[in-house]
């Protein structure tokens, strides 16, 4: 005996609940597929790319600006490298260079003044104190705030600020000759307290550095601060003097054969070393590890180096023909550079193409990947609809 129920032809097929549910599920799927471009997850480079300028209240773009796309070739690489070199190789002001003419005394310095064969002057200099602090002045003659120093048997203050110890020695000897026969005087600095420079940023030991008889050059200041930290961007060093900031590209100076030790610092100068993380390049899209990539220690970064830091292109989802570099130029006008990395030879261009601060490197996905992602969104809805239709059949 046949256990199946006979097919009821009295009810039109399109009025049966199970059929209606199944059709509804397929209708939803078809509508979603028709709008696949709008619901596809992830990003995709439009053709042609455009930047929204104005939008309406409901979010629709009312006007846009077409962004030019330039193909990366050897001529373009050479052009960009020349432009960047002209910027990074900007001359350092001549005022920063110089030679040391010897230490010049200043207010706060402590002098040790010895008059030979006259021990009575030793008491005037004072005796060392026990349990002294590092900030305490050493025993001796302190140069006053007006730049003068007092010494026994000399009726007038000796002008010391702006002079070398040997010049002060000669002046004291000349005055003491009025009282003693052929006095022999020695003047040395017991404590350097007149001037400091300040080093901050990406050095191992930021802080103030006292200027002494060793010329305070840029290199000396960095070395006293423990040297550049691994995070330092040696292309972005700034000297601030009297309210004016002077950028110094230390890496470029060395490449050009200019010794940074010829840059002389003055009392009150601020030396700041920028961090590499302050000027990153953003790598996103179909790469294995999307990341914010800092430049190298010399401030440079190429396209191939950035992709390498991001784990290279994702071989399953990336379209190697669609690698883009998005950049905002000096006039705030955006530009997009395109490189086809399908051929390994194009890696030579990527290895030479220089990136700039805040560039965005974007690797597009393939059309199949976009379709697959849309289907992955729709399959759960379709399956649920079909299951519901079968259950209620």
Predicted regions and their residues:
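Amphipathic, non-transmembrane alpha-helical segments in extracytoplasmic/periplasmic proteins
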Residues: 109-117, 146, 164-180, 199, ...
């Amino acid at each position: 005996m046949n256990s199946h129920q006979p097919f009821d032809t009295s009810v039109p097929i399109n009025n049966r609940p199970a059929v209606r549910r199944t059709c509804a599920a397929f209708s939803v799927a078809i509508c979603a597929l028709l709008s696949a471009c709008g619901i596809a997850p992830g990003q995709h480079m439009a053709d042609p790319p455009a930047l929204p300028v104005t939008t309406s209240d409901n979010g629709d773009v009312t006007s846009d600006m077409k962004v030019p796309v330039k193909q990366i070739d050897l001529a373009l690489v050479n052009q960009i490298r020349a432009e960047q070199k002209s910027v990074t190789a900007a001359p350092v002001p001549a005022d920063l260079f110089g030679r040391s003419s010897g230490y010049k005394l200043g207010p706060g310095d402590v002098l040790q003044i010895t008059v030979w064969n006259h021990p009575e002057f030793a008491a005037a200099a004072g005796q060392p104190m026990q349990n002294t602090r590092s900030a305490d002045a050493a025993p001796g003659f302190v140069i006053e705030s007006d730049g003068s120093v007092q010494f026994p048997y000399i009726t007038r203050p000796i002008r010391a600020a702006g002079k070398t110890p040997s010049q002060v020695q000669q002046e004291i000897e000349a005055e003491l000759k009025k009282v003693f026969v052929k006095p022999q005087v020695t003047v040395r600095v017991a404590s350097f307290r007149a001037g400091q420079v300040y080093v901050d940023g990406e050095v191992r030991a930021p802080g103030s550095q006292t200027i002494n008889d060793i010329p305070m050059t840029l290199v000396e200041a960095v070395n006293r601060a423990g040297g550049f930290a691994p995070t330092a961007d040696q292309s972005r060093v700034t000297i601030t003097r009297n309210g004016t900031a002077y950028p110094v590209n230390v890496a470029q100076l060395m490449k050009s054969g200019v010794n940074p030790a010829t840059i002389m610092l003055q009392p009150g100068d601020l030396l700041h070393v920028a961090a590499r993380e302050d000027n990153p390049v953003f790598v996103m899209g179909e790469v294995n590890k999307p990341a914010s990539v800092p430049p190298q220690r010399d401030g440079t970064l190429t396209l191939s180096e950035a992709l390498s830091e991001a784990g290279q292109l994702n071989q399953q989802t990336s379209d190697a023909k669609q690698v883009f570099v998005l950049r905002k130029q000096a006039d705030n006008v955006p530009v997009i550079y395109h490189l086809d990395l399908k051929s390994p030879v194009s890696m030579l261009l990527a290895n030479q193409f220089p990136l700039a601060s805040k560039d965005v490197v974007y690797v597009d996905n393939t059309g199949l990947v976009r379709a697959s992602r849309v289907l992955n969104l729709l399959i759960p809805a379709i399956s649920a609809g079909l299951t519901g239709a079968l259950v209620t059949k």
